[in-house]
Amino acid sequence: MTCPDKPGQLINWFICSLCVPRVRKLWSSRRPRTRRNLLLGTACAIYLGFLVSQVGRASLQHGQAAEKGPHRSRDTAEPSFPEIPLDGTLAPPESQGNGSTLQPNVVYITLRSKRSKPANIRGTVKPKRRKKHAVASAAPGQEALVGPSLQPQEAAREADAVAPGYAQGANLVKIGERPWRLVRGPGVRAGGPDFLQPSSRESNIRIYSESAPSWLSKDDIRRMRLLADSAVAGLRPVSSRSGARLLVLEGGAPGAVLRCGPSPCGLLKQPLDMSEVFAFHLDRILGLNRTLPSVSRKAEFIQDGRPCPIILWDASLSSASNDTHSSVKLTWGTYQQLLKQKCWQNGRVPKPESGCTEIHHHEWSKMALFDFLLQIYNRLDTNCCGFRPRKEDACVQNGLRPKCDDQGSAALAHIIQRKHDPRHLVFIDNKGFFDRSEDNLNFKLLEGIKEFPASAVSVLKSQHLRQKLLQSLFLDKVYWESQGGRQGIEKLIDVIEHRAKILITYINAHGVKVLPMNE
């Protein structure tokens, strides 16, 4: 047992050593209990007074030591609590003059801020992408296209000639809109075919996930990038009466003639035809696959740099007539007769006296569904007989509205096939109208149609049409921004969804069949 070194502890030890044996002896003796309790209480009171005196002496010594410390004026006095350093470290305790360390009476707490992880919003955070340098290998007898491009098309006629499938029926110079002109702006070099735009800039077709949407094929993505990003090697008019222009794009073989065929081309239309881009994406989502790839592009050398739709030039389209802009001449009356004959359905070869064309019966059902959703009237209702047209509509401008009295003789327009595939149609000039009210929808487009494609109807009935359109249209950066971002795109989708509900109601009310059309 060690002896205490301080005076206070020595006294406590002495009292305890004397009192404890005597208390035990007193407790075990036979004295009266009253006297024993009195003695025990007196001893406890004496010890309690001693403890109080010890506490008072200790507090007095602590106050004197504080007065001897370094003096600080009240003007510069720190708060009574120590500050927590911003860097998360603690300062060492202050040292006394005698070399001893003053023990602080405050517990220091180091606060470590919680690291906030940024929100990864799909479609807004662009990951880093590896640069891939692919070398295109050309097959014998074909010219390789540099970068993301198309397979070389067969040789076409000169670009300054009348273009099949595009020329005469598309009078794109609108009243009050300035005609096309060449503007020397940024990214355009004067002199011959060198209107090259910078090729090192970021692609306008943005794909941030590992793969593109399933309804867009690899060829679709490659062609979209070709139209959106390739430099322009030449600019030629389609026809003297048309406002459209052919852009001869970079990507042909070195030394190739600057014309469509050896070089890839795109048909550049005016800003008012921007709905062509929406039509392309809707066609792919519905599984029709009848439109040509279309993107939106800012043409620095024309139209003051405003976004314009550019559609892939396809040299495989059949030649079109100048009056109806169609590869097959049909009137409304003959078209209704073809619908009754159901030409080529279920593999049946039509009889010679049936008057059938080479076009499959299901193609008309797909066209009618597509045209109704976008309210395209320039194919099946060129005279605007099924709705109330506006003054700026082509049928009013051309004076065709009074011809509705004889609808059977009204000619169909923009009925185009491919040379190597006459059974299927190609939907061109797909300018849609989103401002058509519900009471002014053109139901004439659905006359005579008794079947609709099951794949397209299933998409319209599902709850995923909006999601797919947003995902698909987001790929085209220029189109997305030109429509006001997501808010503007949502308004267009609202119109399509409402028309889809009306079409489903029409199908149920008229007993129209929904069939698989994957012939």
Swiss-Prot record:
Q: Look up the domain of life of the source.
A: Eukaryota
Q: How does it sit in the membrane?
A: Single-pass type II membrane protein
What transmembrane ranges does the database entry give? 38-55
Q: Which ranges does the record list as Cytoplasmic topological domains?
A: 1-37
Annotated region described as Disordered, given as residue ranges: 62-103
Its signal peptide is none
Task: Output the InterPro entries linked to this UniProt entry.
Answer: FAM198
Give start-end positions of Basic and acidic residues composition bias.
68-77
Instruction: Give the UniProt entry's GO cellular component terms.
Output: Golgi apparatus; Golgi membrane
UniProt keyword annotations, A-Z: Glycoprotein, Golgi apparatus, Membrane, Signal-anchor, Transmembrane, Transmembrane helix
Q: Where in the cell is it found?
A: Golgi apparatus membrane
Pfam families the record matches: FAM198
Q: Which residues lie on this side of the membrane: Extracellular?
A: 56-519
- Residues with glycosylation annotation: 289
Do the record's keywords include Metal-binding?
no
Specify whether Glycoprotein is a keyword of the entry.
Answer: yes
Read off the PANTHER family from this record.
GOLGI-ASSOCIATED KINASE 1B, GOLGI-ASSOCIATED KINASE 1B-RELATED
Q: Which family does it belong to?
A: Belongs to the GASK family.
In its UniProt entry, what is this protein called? Answer: Golgi-associated kinase 1B
Gene it is expressed from: GASK1B
